[in-house]
């Protein structure tokens, strides 16, 4: 196994099965963040993740962290909070603000550089990247964004500036996603936070099989239309 240097003149990727075991899932470096290359990556189960100043690194870890939306774990306290939630939740109202929020709300730095923000904003304008916003009155207090692949959603990042804001984003999105035929959420790499929400690890081979099936599926044509998903009770 060896690390592959990508060409700027081709958007082809090597097979994810050739990714390194250590660091787990590192597959290639270089290339660019053009919409065509990003979409090719997601279609093959590959995503970019790198530190500012480093070359673009491309990953496909084994195992892969996923969340079956129906298995989302909601604690009793979160259920009580949501019943009296002060938040309004929207979809695709403020993609730019959400990704900026994800980039700025990291105390120890972030991989979401200016170039990454611009790249995913282009994907959003093309209808492939989407955001969920959580509002307290007119203030954006949390949210999440990711890339759609048919009935699979590749979650990228989330942020929270008030109590339970990011959990509210995920809860409301999962309910809406399941209700319209969504099947699976890609969480990339398991961490304590995603594990507490019900995410689990599956073999990369299984994830790629799910991806190949689900990316050909379709949600309703109007699913990603900007709209309000949840409003607080009066």
From Swiss-Prot:
Q: Which SUPFAM superfamilies does the entry mention?
A: Acyl-CoA N-acyltransferases (Nat)
Subunit comment: Monomer.
- NCBIfam families reported for this sequence: aat (TIGR00667)
Q: Which domain of life is it from?
A: Bacteria
Q: What's a GO cellular component annotated to this UniProt protein?
A: cytoplasm
Q: What is this protein called?
A: Leucyl/phenylalanyl-tRNA--protein transferase
Q: Does the keyword Acyltransferase apply?
A: yes
The question of whether Protein biosynthesis is a record keyword is answered with: no
What reactions does this protein catalyze? N-terminal L-lysyl-[protein] + L-leucyl-tRNA(Leu) = N-terminal L-leucyl-L-lysyl-[protein] + tRNA(Leu) + H(+); N-terminal L-arginyl-[protein] + L-leucyl-tRNA(Leu) = N-terminal L-leucyl-L-arginyl-[protein] + tRNA(Leu) + H(+); L-phenylalanyl-tRNA(Phe) + an N-terminal L-alpha-aminoacyl-[protein] = an N-terminal L-phenylalanyl-L-alpha-aminoacyl-[protein] + tRNA(Phe)
According to its UniProt entry, the protein's GO biological process terms are: protein catabolic process
Cysteine-cysteine disulfides: none
Q: Which compartments is it annotated to reside in?
A: Cytoplasm
Q: Which organism's genome codes for this protein?
A: Escherichia coli (strain K12)
What Gene3D superfamilies does the entry give? Leucyl/phenylalanyl-tRNA-protein transferase, C-terminal domain, Leucyl/phenylalanyl-tRNA-protein transferase, N-terminal domain
Instruction: Please name the InterPro entries in this protein's record.
Output: Acyl_CoA_acyltransferase, Leu/Phe-tRNA_Trfase, Leu/Phe-tRNA_Trfase_C, Leu/Phe-tRNA_Trfase_N
Q: Which family does it belong to?
A: Belongs to the L/F-transferase family.
EC nos: 2.3.2.6
| One function term, GO molecular function aspect | aminoacyltransferase activity
Chain's role: Functions in the N-end rule pathway of protein degradation where it conjugates Leu, Phe and, less efficiently, Met from aminoacyl-tRNAs to the N-termini of proteins containing an N-terminal arginine or lysine.
Sorted alphabetically, the keyword list is:
Acyltransferase, Cytoplasm, Transferase
